[in-house]
Amino acid sequence: MKNLFDIKDKVIVITGGCGILGKNIANYLAEQGAKIVILDRVEEAGRELEAELNRKSEALFLVTDVLNKEVLEENKKAILERFGTIDVLLNAAGGNMPGATIAPDKTVLDLDVDAFRKVVDLNLFGTVLPTMVFVDVMAKNKKGAIVNFCSESALRPLTRVVGYGSAKAAIGNYTRYMATELATKFSPELRVNAIVPGF
């Protein structure tokens, strides 16, 4: 029987690849023989990670902006020129801001709406836009996998991170929509899942 978990030579794109989760996942996947594409906005850290990953497998770093579709399209072009395809997308870009968090001495009424909006943009639209740009390659191939990063804070208000938790809850819903849409309209071998890292 074929090894269902063999990822050797699979082209895996990781947004937010220089973050704690992205970097550790990238290292593990490279050790398994996957070809890793790191997309991140921090060039120095990206170049260092690219060199580290290239000692284990084949890797490419590209500067990106997950909120800019034109930049993502340029990233896709570079990935296809280098590797010819995209097998997996890991949407690991995300983060939080103090203004979108309820301070211990404040209430939800004190939230900074601009900060809240930025956190939703980064986490939700930073997942939606890369998915929209990269999924067409998988749709043409009739197979592939997208993994979105959700959070325990999306499931219950464990801490005061209301902006982050709200965005991650939306990602969970978006994941369900995309899973249904892609499987029914393109291929059942095109999967979309979300993981909920613990802390």
Describe the residue ranges of each PLM region:
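Conserved glycine-rich Rossmann-like NAD(P)H-binding loop of the short-chain dehydrogenase/reductase
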Residues: 32-48
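Canonical Rossmann dinucleotide-binding motif of NAD(H)/NADP(H)-dependent dehydrogenases/reductases
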Residues: 3-37
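A short, exposed helix-loop element centered on a Lys and neighboring polar residues
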Residues: 131-132, 176
